[in-house]
Amino acid sequence: MKVYYSLWPLFFMVILPLWMASCYQAPEFPVVPKIDFESVNFKQGATGFDTLIVRVRFQDGDGDLGLGGEENDPPYHSLNFLPSPDGDPCRFSERFDEGCRDVLPPEFNCVDYQYFTTLGQDTIRDTLYVELNPNQNNFMVDIMTKKNGQFEVFNMRELLCVNPLYGRFPPLKDNFSVDGPLEGVIEFKPPSSAYMALFRNDTLKLRIQIKDRALHDSNVIESCEFTLNELLEVGGCPQRP
């Protein structure tokens, strides 16, 4: 199975506690990261791009948190390609050929197919069947909308053919060969011109998860309920009991 790499934009800030730069006794945490919701805010921009500001607290026992934008080798690559019988990626025009037809969906969609002009050093200009690698990002936010009293995930990729609010926060220490606990706050600020157009009148929640370098998934948390106008009026949505 071949892999492909791409870089994702970064809109992160990380706040670490004072004990990390002092003589205080370091705490002990599990090696699987744990997160807690802190707040969500919304800022309207003068240039047409608004910003959703998500803050979570984290703890991790061995401190293997963060991915650099240049870390694109497996297991952090972005895409997998299912090969045709000759070993090359299956192309849309070959989807019914022997060897491809059993793995390719019959209809075009923007989740399973992507158009490429180049692949590595090769010029291809073709549509290829791809599988998204769930390990390419380490901070995942899903927007959920309330319908008939129940929250459901708004699937940006399937409905709009755009990437969801997933990204990478940078490495939180210089040397990952030395284990040590980490805790702090991660702030994710993805900009978009579509927030108000899509969700102006909706009641929303956020579903959030992070992943460490060993591919341990944290617990999944949810934000408080909010509307974008409420965030503008009250200045944010903290966690409520």
Predicted segments with their positions:
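C-terminal motif of bacterial Sec signal peptides marking the signal peptidase cleavage site
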Residues: 18-22
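Non-catalytic macromolecular-recognition regions in eukaryotic signaling proteins
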Residues: 24-241
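Bacterial N-terminal signal peptides that target proteins for export
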Residues: 1-11
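Hydrophobic helical h-region of N-terminal Sec-dependent signal peptides
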Residues: 12-17
